Every structure is written in C-alpha cells, then in structure tokens.
C-alpha cells in the first residue's frame, strides 16, 4: 500500500503545480458548419434517429445516419450522441472537426459496467470521480431484485443483508447511513429508520445507476462518507417522433416469482416530452438449497411519471413516483424462549419438522412500506457561460410493522412510522472557457418523522424534526490530458427528538451540528489508454435518531436494538485512487483506498436477550470507536476475439479499531469473480445471441472478532456458478425487437452462508434460482 501511495500522489501534486502555473487560453474558434455521419462500430451500418445535442439545441440523424451541425458553434461546445442500446459519446466541436472523415463510431452496450466520465452539462458524474455506472440493458437483467443486489457486481461494492430480500450496498466497507442514495436527484430518506430494510427503490424505474466511491460530501452533503449511489432516469425524448416504449414479463423458480413492467414515452415537437413507467412483482416462500424459508413472500407495486418542457433557454420537468411493498418476516427468526433461540443459532437452520409447504400467503409478522416522491426541476441557460438549476421535492415514507399479538390485535401495527421531507436546491454552473468551470450551490431540507398513535406499543424511535442547510463551491480545471477539481462546503443541521420510554418518562433532546468539508481530486492521461484518477476528501454525518434512541425490535434482522444517546458525529478522511488501462483487447483497473473514521458507529451483541409476545430476540447495542479501513480492488477484461471476453475481478478490505487493532464487524471477506462471455450477430446481423458463465469465490472471513458476533466462528468459504443466455430477435417491426433472457443463479444448488448476511444465524442463503424474461421494445 505504501508503494501505491508513493507512486500515485506525485501525479496529483504535478497536476496541482500545473494549475498554479496557469495556462494560455486561446480565443474560441467558430465552426463553419459540420457534416457528421454516425455508424455502428461493429457492423459499420448507419444509425438513423441518433439523438444529437449541442448547446441548448438538438436534432436527430437522418436515414443515412447523417446530421449537419449548424454554423456558429464555439469550438469548445460539447456535442453528445445518444442512442438506445449504445454507449453515449460526447465530443467538442474542435475534436469533431479533427475526427477522421467526420465519422462517429457508436459502440453497442455489451458490458455490464461502464466507466464514469464527464459527458454533457448536468451530468451527475465527474471525470475526477472514481466510480462506475450500470446501464439500462444491464438493469433489465435484474428484474425482481433490489438495489443492493443490482450493484454488488461493481468493483469495491458488496452487500450486507438481513434475510432473503432486505439488503443494502456496501462501498469500501461503508454501509447503511454512510452511503447516500439519490433517487432521481432527491436524497432517499427512509433509511433514517434504521439498517434493517432495503431502500424502497424499484429497479424497473431506473434508467441508469451510478456508484461514486469517494468521500462526496462537498457535492452531496452529509452522509456521503463511503460514497454515493445515484438512481436516475434517461433524458426525456424531446426529439423522438412517435410513441416508443417496452414491456417485460419475467419469472423465477425460487419463490415462484412473477412480474411485469412497462414503459411508454413520447416527444412532442422538440419542446414537450413525457414518460410513464409501471411495475408489479409477486413472490412466495423462498428456498435454500435444502429447505424452504417460510413467510418470505413479497409484493411490490411501483409507478413513475415524467413531463418535461423546454425552449431555447428555459426547461422544466415534473416527476412523480410511488412504490408500495409488502414483505413477510422469516418465521425462523422468531423463537419462543431463550433456550430455543440459542439452540436455533447453534443449529444455524430450522428443524425439518417446523417447515411447512410452500405458500404465497404472507402471514404475521410482516411489514408494509410506501415511498412517494414529487419533484419539480427547472433550468435556465442564458448563454454558453452560465446555467442555473433549481429543484424542489417532497417525499412521503410510510412503514407499518405487524406481529402476532394477543387479544386479536395482530391486525394493528406495532410500529407505524410516517416520514415527510421537503428538499430544495439551487445550482449555478459557470464555464469561463474550455478549461475552467465553477459550480456552486445551496441546499435546504426539512424532515418531520412521527409515530402514529394507537399501536398499543412504545415506539422504537421517538418523533423528531430535522432541518439542514448546505452551501458549496467546486472549481474544475481540465485539459485533454489532465485536470484537477477543488471543492469546499459548509453544512448545518438541527435535530429535535421527543419520545416516551417504557417507564412513561420523556426522552430526547436537541442536537446542533455545523461542519466544514473539502475535497481535491485530479486525473491524468499518463499514456495512450492509461488514466490515473485520485481524490482526497473529508466527510461527516451526525448520528441518526435510530442510532441515538432506538429501543425496540428490528424485525428484519430478528434482533432487539438499544440506542446510545451519547453518540458523536462520525468524521471521515478518505483517499481513493484508480489506475485504468484501455486498448482494443485489454481493459484493466486497479483501485486503492484509505479511510480514517473518527467516532465510527457500529452494532454489537450484548449477550443478553429480550422476550416479547412475538418471540425472544438477541439484544444489540450501539457503540462507537475510531476506525481505519483500507483496501484494494482490481479487475481485468481480455478480448481475445471480437465476440469473446473474459473478466476476473477481486477485492480485499482491512478494517480495524485504531486504538486496539480489533477487527470491525460485518466487513466483506476476500472475493473473486470470473466471467467468460460470448456474443454473436446471427442471420446476417439481424439477430444477436449471447451466453456467459460466471464463477464467484468468497473466502472465509478470518479477520473476525467473536466478541462482536452471536457465534464464535465465521461461515466457511464457498464457490457459486451462474449462467446467462440471451437472444435478441430483430426485424419484428421498424425499430422494434424482442429480447429473451435466461439466467441461473447458484447453478449447482450450493448450500452456503454469507458472512455479511445477518440472517445466517437462523438459515442458509438462497439455493438455485432460474430466471426467465421476455422484453418487447418498440
């Protein structure tokens, strides 16, 4: 690690020195009109209907794939080329004029992951950022899964689970409230209730998911300690003629899952566009390799609507979305007494005589959740130098938890939470010239969380209100070969909590937080195809109310949680760097990171138990320490032939308490992933076929402290094998196709346990799952 630091830091220092030395900026040249031809990089056939945006205007290529860019565009004007199923390309007018023959080669999206680069204005990623994105085609293969499951294949990203469907992403060892999730540009707030449930985000509503791995507090504010996950829609199709969309039917053998999703969108006269999405899924009891997991069924409904309008300088967009979910709680995590609970944890699985036949019925206990969002976003671009953006959003989150209760009261929720949030943001983007940019913004947010009365149970967390503000500025200087970015941000937060405990006593209080964070990053094209990115930054988060005052059952994990009102704010200093190499047959990436966390918050069993009407549960307490985390992730993809690729990736993390060296709990062990994939054009290129074989190895977690767990050992290592087969049937109609997908997870039905699945105390992970989907795109 020291060698990596010695080799990487000098590049960042050189970049800073170059900024301080200044640069001569030439006057902007003006284009004289430019004819561009867009073709498929594999078939060399022209691509009609490609969306081409330049400045505040846009158009589409004709039937021959040609477009004539207008005269008068500045040499540094960015021109972007977008087409469904192809990787987006963004180039300046100056580069287009120097391109060979004025021909743009667009590459079909065949890889699951794309590197994050700067493209057009308003994009959520930056060239200095270390991260990756998952495109719409790959998300289409994740139907029926949650957000954490969809992103766990990204370098440096793993999963922490609380059962068969409640999981959260882990970035460089950070999870829960340390990962900020932006749902269509709005901070997802329901995670403040605790870590026992997955984010209420439907993948069917996502056009793209981006994972940023640095300490991103300067741009995104508090809670972005470990990174940011951005779930967003594709741009509205203003220039699209006619109605387009898709519909997908999917099913899976594990849980006998079935579902349907659909999308319809249309552009109207280049100034108006709309989009509507919908999704429904239904599943019953899931299954391990050897036995059923009773009461693990799930129902989910979601919808999203967008309406956008734009003129030469103004634009406005309204987005409304809603998600409803009902999910059962595994019976095996609900024991009648302490002895039975200890026996079940020692067995690590339910006895065969208590397992009942498969059913879709969701019985007590279960929970229902609802997430609704409304957002209005506006933009104003008076000229090529200035752009202003404003956003206001409202979200409503509801959660009801039902348990088996006495006196026929099971239909009354034991917990009924309502969380409302209003968020506003105003941004200013200034482009001084083709090298220098400045972005500044101000954010305000207000949250009101309360417990509905009438449950007959003391709430797990108190009622609270929380207000916050943030102001930041980021300066970016970039050339074709290198660039730097420096940012600073100030934040303030006030939280007032009021509750009543089991003894009828009031508790709570008022917390004030003010923080200053900063970041500095850079990139350098060291050689042809070799790129270095590095970022250093600080971040912070205040302890959430659930960590301060929790006193109740976390039904997802089957544990009773006790908060700690003396917690202090977590403060992080993080350095992350990546080195990537690209040529026609080899893609290689190496990432390293160091994180120092003051006042690291974690959960630890107390070795005590709490008995409720619904069962007996282990007692966990919230604790705090100073921690150090560092790790490395690597990935190599080889293309021996144009139709064949082989990818291998691996990641390792070390996480310790600074004062004692003691291992931190729930850190992912060493893992290795492999995939060999073939793709072919068949029947003269009219159709496409693909097949891939995956292998995953997860080592036993030897960096494990038994005092931080309910059991004295970590699960053994395991191997999993998967298979994916796809076929795209083209020529159904103009611009239409049908995609057939078949995937098999855990092909050999391996029985195993994942260390970071907190339900491993009671059961194994899922067995074989065969999934099939058929999508019609029109």
Question: Which residue ranges define each predicted feature?
Answer:
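Short, acidic, small-residue-rich periplasmic hinge/interaction motif at the N-terminus
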Residues: 37-43, 51-53, 82-86, 97-140, ...
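Outer-membrane beta-barrel translocator/receptor signature
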Residues: 205-207, 218-289, 295-303, 311-314, ...
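C-terminal beta-signal and adjacent terminal beta-strands/loops
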Residues: 540, 596-599, 603, 697-704, ...
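Outer membrane beta-barrel strand-and-loop segments of large Gram-negative receptors
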Residues: 415-427, 562-568, 574, 583, ...
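Gram-negative outer-membrane beta-barrel transporters
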Residues: 593-596, 608, 615-701
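N-terminal periplasmic accessory domains that precede
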Residues: 100-105, 138, 147-150, 167-170, ...
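Short acidic/polar hinge/loop motifs at secondary-structure boundaries
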Residues: 70, 149, 187-215
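Flexible loop and strand-edge segments within Gram-negative outer membrane beta-barrel domains
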Residues: 283, 289, 294-296, 300, ...
């Amino acid at each position: 690690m020291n060698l990596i630091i010695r080799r990487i830091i000098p590049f960042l220092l050189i970049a800073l020195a170059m900024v301080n030395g200044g640069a001569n900026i030439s006057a902007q040249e003006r284009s004289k009109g430019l004819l561009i031809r867009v073709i498929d990089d594999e078939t060399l056939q022209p691509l009609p209907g490609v969306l081409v945006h330049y400045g505040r205007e846009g158009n589409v290529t004709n039937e021959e794939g040609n477009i004539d860019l207008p005269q008068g565009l500045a040499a540094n004007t960015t021109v972007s080329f977008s087409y469904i199923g192809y990787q987006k390309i963004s180039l300046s007018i100056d580069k287009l004029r120097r391109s060979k023959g004025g021909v743009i080669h667009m590459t079909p999206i065949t890889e699951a992951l794309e590197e994050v680069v700067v493209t057009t204005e308003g994009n959520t990623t930056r060239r200095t950022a270390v991260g990756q994105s998952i495109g719409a085609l790959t998300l289409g293969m994740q139907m029926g899964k949650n957000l954490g499951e969809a992103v766990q294949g990204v370098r440096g990203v793993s999963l922490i689970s609380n059962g068969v469907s409640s999981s959260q992403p882990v970035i460089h060892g950070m999870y829960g409230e340390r990962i900020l999730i932006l749902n269509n540009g709005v901070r997802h707030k329901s995670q403040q209730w605790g870590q026992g449930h997955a984010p209420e985000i439907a993948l069917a509503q996502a056009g793209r998911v981006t994972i940023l791995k640095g300490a991103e507090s300067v741009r995104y504010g508090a809670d972005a300690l470990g990174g940011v996950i951005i779930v967003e829609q594709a741009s509205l199709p203003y220039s699209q003629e006619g109605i387009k969309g898709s519909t997908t039917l999917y099913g899976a053998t594990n849980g006998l899952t079935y579902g349907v999703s659909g999308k319809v969108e249309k552009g109207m006269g280049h100034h108006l566009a709309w989009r509507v999405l919908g999704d429904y899924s239904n599943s019953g009891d899931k299954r391990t390799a050897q036995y059923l997991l009773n009461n693990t069924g799930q129902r989910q409904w979601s919808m999203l609507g967008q309406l956008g309008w734009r003129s030469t300088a103004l634009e406005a967009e309204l987005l409304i979305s809603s998600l409803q979910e009902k999910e059962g709680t595994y019976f095996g995590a609900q024991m009648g007494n302490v002895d039975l609970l200890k026996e079940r944890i020692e067995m690590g699985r339910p006895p065969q005589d208590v397992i009942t036949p498969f059913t879709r019925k969701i019985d007590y206990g279960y929970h229902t959740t609802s997430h609704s969002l409304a957002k209005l976003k506006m933009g104003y671009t008076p000229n090529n130098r200035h752009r202003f953006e404003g956003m206001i959003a409202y979200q409503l989150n509801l959660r009801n938890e039902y348990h088996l209760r006495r006196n026929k009261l099971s239909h009354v929720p034991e917990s009924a939470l309502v969380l409302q949030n209003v968020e506003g943001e105003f941004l200013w983007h200034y482009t001084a010239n083709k090298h220098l940019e400045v972005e500044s913004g101000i954010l305000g947010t207000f949250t009101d969380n309360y417990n509905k009365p009438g449950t007959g149970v003391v709430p797990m967390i108190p009622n609270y209100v929380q207000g916050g503000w943030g102001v930041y500025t980021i300066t970016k200087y970039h050339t074709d070969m290198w660039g730097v970015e420096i940012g600073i941000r100030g934040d303030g937060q006030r939280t007032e909590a009021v509750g009543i405990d089991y003894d009828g006593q009031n508790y709570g209080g008022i917390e004030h937080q003010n923080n200053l964070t900063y970041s500095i990053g850079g990139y350098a094209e060291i050689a042809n195809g070799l790129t270095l990115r590095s970022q250093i930054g600080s971040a912070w988060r205040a302890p959430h109310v659930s960590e301060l005052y929790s006193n109740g059952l976390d039904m997802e994990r089957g544990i009773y949680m006790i908060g700690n009102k003396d917690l202090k704010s977590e403060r992080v200093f993080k350095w992350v760097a990546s080195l990537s190499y690209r040529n026609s047959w080899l893609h290689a990436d190496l990432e390293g990171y160091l994180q120092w966390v003051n006042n690291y918050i974690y959960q630890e069993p107390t070795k005590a138990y709490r008995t409720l009407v619904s069962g007996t549960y282990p007692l966990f307490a919230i604790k705090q320490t100073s921690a150090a985390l560092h790790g490395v992730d690597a990935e190599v993809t080889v293309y021996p032939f144009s139709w064949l690729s082989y990818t291998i990736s691996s990641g390792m993390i070390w996480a310790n308490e600074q004062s004692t060296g003691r291992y931190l709990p729930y850190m992912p062990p060493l893992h290795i992933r492999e995939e060999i994939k073939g793709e072919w054009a068949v029947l003269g290129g009219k159709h496409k076929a693909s097949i891939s074989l995956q292998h995953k190895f997860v080592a036993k977690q030897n960096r494990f402290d038994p005092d931080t767990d309910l059991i004295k050992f970590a699960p053994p290592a395991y191997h999993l094998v998967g298979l994916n087969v796809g076929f795209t049937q083209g020529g159904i109609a103009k611009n239409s196709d049908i995609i057939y997908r078949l995937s098999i997870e855990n092909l050999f039905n391996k029985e195993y346990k994942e260390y970071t699945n907190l339900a491993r105390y009671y059961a194994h992970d899922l067995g074989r799952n065969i999934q099939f989907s058929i999508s019609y795109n029109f």
